[in-house]
From Swiss-Prot:
The enzyme's E.C. designation: 7.3.2.3
Keyword Translocase: yes
Enzyme class at the top of the EC tree: translocase
InterPro entries to which the protein is assigned, alphabetical: AAA+_ATPase, ABC_SmlMolc_Importer, ABC_transporter-like_ATP-bd, ABC_transporter-like_CS, CysA_C, Mo/tungstate-bd_C_term_dom, P-loop_NTPase, Sulph_transpt1
Top-level taxonomy: Bacteria, Pseudomonadati, Pseudomonadota, Betaproteobacteria, Burkholderiales
Sites where the protein binds ATP: 35-42
Pfam family, one: ABC_tran
Cellular localisation: Cell inner membrane
Native source organism of the sequence: Bordetella parapertussis (strain 12822 / ATCC BAA-587 / NCTC 13253)
Family under the similarity heading: Belongs to the ABC transporter superfamily. Sulfate/tungstate importer (TC 3.A.1.6) family.
Name the record gives this protein: Sulfate/thiosulfate import ATP-binding protein CysA
Record-linked PROSITE patterns: ABC_TRANSPORTER_1 (PS00211), ABC_TRANSPORTER_2 (PS50893), CYSA (PS51237)
Location of the ABC transporter domain: 3-237
Membrane topology designation: Peripheral membrane protein
Subunit structure: The complex is composed of two ATP-binding proteins (CysA), two transmembrane proteins (CysT and CysW) and a solute-binding protein (CysP).
Length: 354
């Protein structure tokens, strides 16, 4: 079942949580709502679920207006960050809860409930824990049980609010890959909230970048990474250097450094910022003929296959970050305190707005 939101707005007092947000999600699609704290992503998720009401706009499921439909009638599965499992119930009883509290006319028989619960526990690969209590489970196991409970009521839509946020990094990585595989089996429209860029880019079919209550960009993980639509998206998705210069007729310049600025073909000495990823910066020793930004190597730290360099510009001491393969760093023989030239080889240039 598809999900569509049209012109959603929501205020909490003077704070504008959502500002005319519109979005369409297809059946079977896994969509990530990504952004910093306070950007509106959880508010949007809660309005879709029916846990929060919008001041304006509408929510449609499969083309039918569900804006005023009670949360209990929306057939939405919701998974919270902190599991919300009943401590006094076993794993089996937690998963069965949504089925057992249905109105008598809609409640399955105990035999069908048992079969359904065992099937779901098998789906999340935890059928062997049916008689355990939440306190006897790991964080990752609790989250999978919470997901099984959400699926027990056969939701038309699955919503997850930072489902792995309370878990350690290794477990989080394992579970998000598991969620991707599970979603492909279920084939329902799923939306999950996260502030973790890596999580969104790895798991989602599409990523919705949100900022200050508005959508900045919607696209596949590859699209938003390779072609960020706004300075915010560029800055939020990974590390980036911001180099202030000027653009004229599609060329950005800073001192002797020149880079293409195809988005600014009519610019005439316009202030512009080049957004450069650390891995798109080459290094040369000071005194070479090649153009570059004079810097001094402040600090180096090695992490796996890469060396991360903190460079201080010699004109204003602003920091530039560079990332080079560890073997290349060792072959260059660079030392902290050494004078170098930072040479950006690729950038996305945005005009400075007046």
């Amino acid at each position: 079942m598809s999900i569509e939101v049209r012109g959603l707005s929501k205020r909490f007092g003077a704070f504008r949580a959502l500002d005319e947000v519109s979005l369409h999600i297809e059946t079977g699609e896994l969509v990530a709502l990504l952004g910093p704290s306070g950007c509106g992503k959880t508010t949007l998720l809660r309005i879709i679920a029916g846990l929060e009401s919008a001041d304006a706009g509408s929510v449609l499921f499969a083309g039918e207006d569900a804006t005023e439909v009670d949360v209990r009638q929306r057939q939405v599965g919701f998974v919270f960050q902190h599991y919300a499992l009943f401590k006094h119930m076993t794993v089996f009883e937690n998963v069965a809860f949504g089925l057992r509290v249905r109105h008598r006319s809609q409640r399955p028989s105990e035999a069908r409930i048992r079969a359904k619960v065992l099937d779901l526990l098998g789906l999340v690969q935890l059928d062997w824990l049916a008689d355990r209590y939440p306190a006897q489970l790991s964080g990752g196991q609790r989250q999978r049980i919470a997901l099984a409970r959400a699926l027990a009521v056969e939701p038309r839509v699955l919503l997850l609010d930072e489902p792995f946020g309370a878990l350690d990094a290794k477990v989080r990585k394992e579970l998000r890959r598991w969620l991707r595989r599970l979603h492909d089996e279920l084939h329902v429209a799923s939306v999950f909230v996260t502030h973790d860029q890596e999580e969104a880019l790895e798991v989602a079919d599409r990523v919705v970048l949100m900022n200050a209550g508005r959508i900045e960009q919607v696209g596949s993980p590859r699209e938003v990474w390779e072609r960020p639509a706004t300075p915010f998206v560029y800055g939020f998705l990974g590390d980036v250097n911001q180099l202030h210069g000027h653009a004229t007729r599609g060329v950005w310049r800073l001192g002797e450094v020149a880079l293409p600025a195809p988005d600014l073909p009519e610019a005439d000495n316009q202030r512009a910022i080049a957004y450069v990823r650390p891995h798109d910066i080459d290094l040369a020793r000071a005194g070479t003929a090649a153009p570059g930004i004079p810097v001094r190597l402040n600090h180096v730290y090695l992490a796996g296959p890469s060396a991360y360099l903190e460079l201080a510009r010699q004109d204003d001491q602003a920091i530039i970050e560079a990332q080079v393969p560890e073997p290349l760093f060792r072959s260059l023989g660079l030392k902290e305190g050494e004078a170098l030239l930072a040479q950006p080889r690729r950038a996305r240039v945005f005009a400075v707005q007046p």
